């Protein structure tokens, strides 16, 4: 078989007992591939392992986990300086795997691993919030954010992405919109939002298509605001034709500014960030990612 450069897998500690993954790695090693494996234990491990990966001279750093793990690894990669920065590979092992699913990463471990190692590396965008925190997939605010951050771990482990819908339905009686003002390029809106989605990717919360028109290499962020009483169809993903729906506000811009009279929380690839003022901007072609040739999120 063809020779491939070495790669380093950064594996979320929750997946250390994944026997099928261990077998898939061993088989690829027997085929001649060099795959280093490092396991995360605490915040900051991913950045340290990316630094180690550069010293090892690997061509790819594979994020093995959910959206949070992909976020940590990709953030560490875009902070690297100099030449020969490794590409990002994706091995979906989380609860929802929203980003991996939307870009077409195979569910089968062996196929996902081979793609992460040998797939074409394509330049994609990332987004940055307040010049500090980054996200590769989506920033979500409002009721949807509270659901994804409050859903019990045991429920997520048992039911996967469906758990977010179930927990959301259980919490319908606590619905409270977030009042805010949002500005962007040729965009201005002010009002009460039940759900805010600002996407580099398209889906969040276990498969909810919040920003269905988003692309990861167009230099733009897609915005979708759900107002009124549209939270239920948003949660169960049964929104019918919404082109003329007055409860859905859409926009596209390379940046958005959000101001709120009270503290609101955004979920950035699974990590909550609270405040009253947010500046979210796109970082064009921020890193290279190994993606399938038919990735639907590429222009």
Curated annotation (Swiss-Prot):
What EC number(s) does the entry state? 2.7.1.-
Q: What family does this belong to?
A: Belongs to the diacylglycerol/lipid kinase family. YegS lipid kinase subfamily.
GO biological process per UniProt: phospholipid biosynthetic process
| Single GO molecular function | lipid kinase activity
- Locations listed in the record: Cytoplasm
Note accompanying the cofactor annotation: Binds 1 Mg(2+) ion per subunit. Ca(2+) may be able to substitute.
Using the record for this protein, list the coiled-coil segments as residue ranges, or answer none.
none
- Species this protein is from: Escherichia coli (strain 55989 / EAEC)
PANTHER family in the record: LIPID KINASE YEGS, SPHINGOSINE KINASE
| Keyword ATP-binding found | yes
Q: Do you know which InterPro entries this protein is assigned to? A: ATP-NAD_kinase_N, Diacylglycerol/lipid_kinase, Diacylglycerol_kinase_cat_dom, Lip_kinase_YegS, Lipid_Phosphate_FormReg, NAD/diacylglycerol_kinase_sf, YegS/DAGK_C
Domain named DAGKc is located at: 2-133
Q: Name one GO cellular component term.
A: cytoplasm
Q: Where is the active site?
A: 271
**Residues that coordinate or bind Mg(2+):** 215, 218, 220
In terms of superkingdom, the source organism counts as Bacteria
Q: What does this protein do?
A: Probably phosphorylates lipids; the in vivo substrate is unknown.
Q: What class of enzyme is it?
A: transferase
Protein's recorded name: Probable lipid kinase YegS
Keyword Kinase in annotation: yes
Keywords (A to Z) from UniProt = ATP-binding, Cytoplasm, Kinase, Lipid biosynthesis, Lipid metabolism, Magnesium, Metal-binding, Nucleotide-binding, Phospholipid biosynthesis, Phospholipid metabolism, Transferase
Q: Which cofactor does it need?
A: Mg(2+); Ca(2+)
Major place of residence = cytoplasm
Query: Pfam families recorded for this chain?
Result: DAGK_cat (PF00781), YegS_C (PF19279)
Residue numbers binding ATP: 40, 66-72, 95
């Amino acid at each position: 078989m063809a020779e491939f450069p070495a790669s380093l897998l950064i594996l979320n500690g929750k997946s250390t007992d994944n026997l099928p993954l261990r077998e898939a790695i061993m088989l690829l090693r027997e085929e001649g591939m060099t795959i280093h494996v490092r396991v995360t234990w605490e915040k900051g491990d991913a950045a340290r392992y990316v630094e180690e990966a550069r010293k090892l001279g690997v061509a790819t750093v594979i994020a093995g986990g959910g959206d949070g793990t992909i976020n940590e690894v990709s953030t560490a990669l875009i902070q690297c300086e100099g030449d020969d920065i490794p590409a990002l590979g994706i091995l979906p092992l989380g609860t929802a795997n929203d980003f991996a699913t939307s870009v077409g990463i195979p569910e089968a471990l062996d196929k996902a691993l081979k793609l992460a190692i040998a797939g074409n590396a394509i330049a994609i965008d990332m987004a940055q919030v307040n010049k500090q925190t980054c996200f590769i997939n989506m920033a979500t605010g409002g009721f949807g954010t509270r659901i994804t951050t409050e859903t019990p771990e045991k429920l997520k482990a048992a039911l996967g992405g469906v758990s977010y819908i179930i927990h959301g339905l259980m919490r319908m009686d606590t619905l409270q919109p977030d009042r805010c003002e949002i500005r962007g390029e040729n965009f201005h809106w002010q009002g009460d939002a039940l759900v805010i989605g600002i996407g580099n990717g398209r889906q969040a919360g276990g498969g909810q298509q919040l920003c269905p028109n988003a692309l990861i290499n167009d230099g733009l962020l897609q915005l979708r605001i759900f107002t009124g009483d549209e939270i239920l169809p948003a949660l169960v993903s049964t929104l019918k034709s919404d082109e003329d729906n007055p409860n859905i506000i859409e926009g596209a811009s390379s940046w958005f500014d959000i101001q709120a009279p009270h503290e609101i929380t955004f979920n950035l690839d699974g990590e909550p960030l609270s405040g009253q003022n947010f500046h979210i901007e796109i970082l064009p072609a921020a890193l290279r990612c190994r993606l399938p040739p038919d990735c639907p999120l590429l222009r």
